[in-house]
């Protein structure tokens, strides 16, 4: 399996060559671009600044130079991956101060992460002619941190509600008070509230045509009332409160507009409506708005980011100067070429093709895998890793597996556990088998083996349209005062519960029969019976309006399909559940390694969690039909 490619016309390296595959790998154009050393002449008025940059090892290419020099008016800088956007952002700040004689306090730099903000501040302070004292008055921070300072300047003294677990506890309490404890996922409710705020939608703006929509508005309203009562605000409130404040306080807005004559924004493709509206207000007077981003890297729509903002920027600002940073300094031509080949099929994008900076005559080529199913896929990846580690060319920490959703990681995790390979899953709060969609199905199987498993019973109660708390309280009381006969199970207690509708009793009887039936089946047949047969679990997910309100049908089907695939190799429930318990235990053990930067572990994460990170060896899923690519 040769991964080094010294030739441009190297055939594609396939694990299994698919029909009608192209013969050669897509290669990005390689060039050695002109730089400021050739482009900036000695008689140029700003040559002194670029000569100082060069002495510090900062050499800009033609497009980067264009972006730095274009200081007036709206500028859209389309920065492809690895094209040096941070160098441009920082060099441009230095240019404004050194060449244009702009005071640092008249410059605002906005980023999306604290780490990025700190890096930009540090780099600016190291620029020629500048120091930490010089840039002390420069405002550089995240949208939230800058907006928070604006709010504090006007007397806002709210406590910050930043802990996600704390917010979930609040929502759980609200749901319990409304008698909806088992009906909504708190995490999803919070995501919907956040999305609404990022779109600047108030509670009154939301629809209320169905009972579920009215319930959501009530949950939303109670959450806001709790925060106001306890004097809290969350991160989304910082955006909304700043937007409202600037709309209401014209004097403050004018003061900020006068101060921030030049505004720079990083990762502009991740901007949401609330952030953009505030940005437009701040830049309204001088319109010196410099935004850097890449619409091809817009992957946070589910959090409220809108790619339309970067796509329509030239329409919002008709005299926009567009600069395309199209030279990748990070990756080799075969990887950049692969990215170009895939992204060109996007319909909504600013047209651009990345080129490569020539650094060597030797190039690594992607290794393509075409597995037949998820199990084959996982085995191929894990064996590929083990081969490298055995040969001494890699360590476990060199590998990362990227995927679209955590459901896809199930088979990979299983193989890593079976082969005793250390791993850490980033970004997911629950393992696949503990997911709220998956767990009830498994608990039906657990109950078929042990009908008196109270923990398993808890998760299936909502599928019988029973209130979990009331049912468990009744059962635990009955277990003390009215023990069951030997032929009875916990489900028989439910038949005696007062206030049951005849249809509920019939459903409980059907579930007792179901448990008897699936006990004799293989795990995969049992799951199918629970999902689409007598268990009617899929129907339950569809007709439960509350669940369908917060759950995409495609996502639920993907999770359940993956669960079916996980059961295929097992002949007995015992072997299947033993493996699941082993995997869950391993997850707990591996969690302790998550915060250890020196741990030698394979990393697993979604593409969203991986943004901005680098690894020596990457496995990534393109999409169905399954195609895994190893990027060295």
Predicted regions and their residues:
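A basic/glycine-biased coupling hinge at the interface between accessory DNA-binding modules
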Residues: 3, 22-54, 73, 94-246, ...
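Conserved RecA-like helicase ATPase core segment
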Residues: 44, 48-52, 273-371
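N-terminal pre-P-loop "Q-motif" helix
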Residues: 56-72, 274
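Helicase P-loop NTPase motor core
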Residues: 77, 83-89, 93, 319-321, ...
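Conserved helicase core region in the C-terminal RecA-like lobe
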Residues: 139-147, 264-267, 292, 405-407, ...
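SF2 helicase catalytic motif II
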Residues: 258-273, 290
């Amino acid at each position: 399996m040769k991964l080094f490619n010294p030739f441009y016309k190297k055939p594609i390296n396939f694990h299994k060559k698919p029909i009608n595959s192209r013969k050669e790998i897509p290669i990005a154009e390689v060039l050695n671009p002109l730089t400021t050393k050739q482009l900036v002449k000695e008689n140029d008025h700003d040559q002194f600044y670029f000569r100082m940059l060069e002495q510090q090892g900062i050499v800009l290419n033609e497009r980067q130079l264009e972006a730095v020099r274009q200081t007036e008016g709206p500028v859209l800088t389309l920065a492809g991956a690895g094209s040096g956007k941070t160098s441009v952002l920082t060099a441009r700040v230095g240019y404004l101060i050194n060449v244009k004689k702009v005071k640092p306090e008249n410059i605002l730099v906005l980023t999306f992460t604290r780490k990025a903000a700190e890096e930009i501040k540090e780099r600016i302070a190291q620029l020629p002619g500048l120091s930490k004292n010089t840039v002390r008055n420069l405002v550089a921070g995240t949208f939230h941190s800058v907006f928070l300072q604006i709010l504090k300047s006007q007397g806002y003294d709210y406590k910050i509600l930043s802990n996600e677990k704390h917010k979930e506890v609040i929502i759980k309490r609200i749901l319990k008070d409304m008698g909806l404890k088992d009906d909504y996922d708190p995490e999803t409710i919070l995501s919907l509230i956040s999305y609404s705020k990022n779109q600047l939608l108030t509670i009154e703006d939301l629809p209320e045509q169905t009972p579920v929509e009215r319930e959501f508005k009530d949950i939303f309203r109670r959450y806001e009332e709790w925060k106001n009562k306890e004097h809290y605000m969350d991160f989304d409130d910082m955006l909304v409160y700043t937007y409202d404040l600037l709309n209401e306080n014209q004097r403050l807005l004018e003061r900020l507009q006068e101060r921030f004559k030049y505004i720079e924004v990083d990762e502009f493709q991740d901007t949401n409506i609330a952030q953009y509206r505030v940005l437009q207000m701040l830049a309204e007077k001088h319109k010196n708005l410099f935004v850097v981003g890449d619409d091809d890297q817009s992957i946070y729509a589910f959090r409220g980011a809108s790619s339309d903002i970067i796509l329509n920027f030239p329409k919002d600002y008709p005299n926009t100067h567009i600069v395309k940073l199209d030279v990748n300094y990070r990756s080799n031509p075969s990887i950049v070429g692969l990215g170009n080949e895939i992204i060109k099929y996007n319909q909504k994008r600013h047209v651009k093709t990345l080129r490569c900076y020539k650094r060597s005559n030797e190039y690594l080529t992607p290794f393509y895998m075409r597995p037949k199913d998820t199990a084959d896929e996982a085995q191929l990846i894990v064996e590929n890793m083990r081969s490298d580690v055995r040969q001494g060319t890699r360590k476990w920490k060199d590998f990362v597996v990227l995927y679209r959703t955590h459901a896809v990681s199930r088979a990979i995790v299983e193989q890593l556990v079976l082969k005793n390979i250390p791993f850490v899953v980033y970004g997911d709060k629950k393992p696949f088998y503990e997911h709220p969609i998956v767990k009830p199905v498994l608990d039906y199987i657990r109950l078929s083996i042990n009908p008196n498993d109270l923990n398993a019973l808890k998760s299936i109660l909502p599928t019988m349209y029973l209130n979990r708390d009331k049912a468990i309280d009744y059962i635990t009381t009955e277990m003390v005062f009215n023990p069951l006969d030997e032929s009875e199970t916990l489900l028989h207690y439910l038949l005696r519960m007062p206030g049951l509708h005849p249809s509920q009793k019939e459903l409980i009887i059907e579930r007792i029969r179901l448990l008897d039936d699936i006990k004799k089946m293989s795990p995969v047949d049992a799951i199918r019976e629970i999902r689409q047969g007598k268990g009617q679990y899929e129907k339950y997910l569809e007709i439960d309006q509350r669940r369908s309100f917060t759950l995409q049908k495609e996502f639920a089907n993907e999770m359940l399909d993956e669960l079916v695939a996980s059961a295929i190799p097992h002949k007995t429930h015992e072997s299947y559940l033993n493996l699941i318990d082993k995997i869950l235990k391993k997850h707990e053990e591996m969690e302790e390694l998550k915060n250890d930067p020196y741990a030698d572990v394979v990393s697993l994460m979604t593409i969203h969690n991986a943004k901005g990170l680098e690894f020596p060896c990457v496995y990534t899923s393109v999409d169905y039909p399954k195609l895994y690519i190893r990027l060295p």
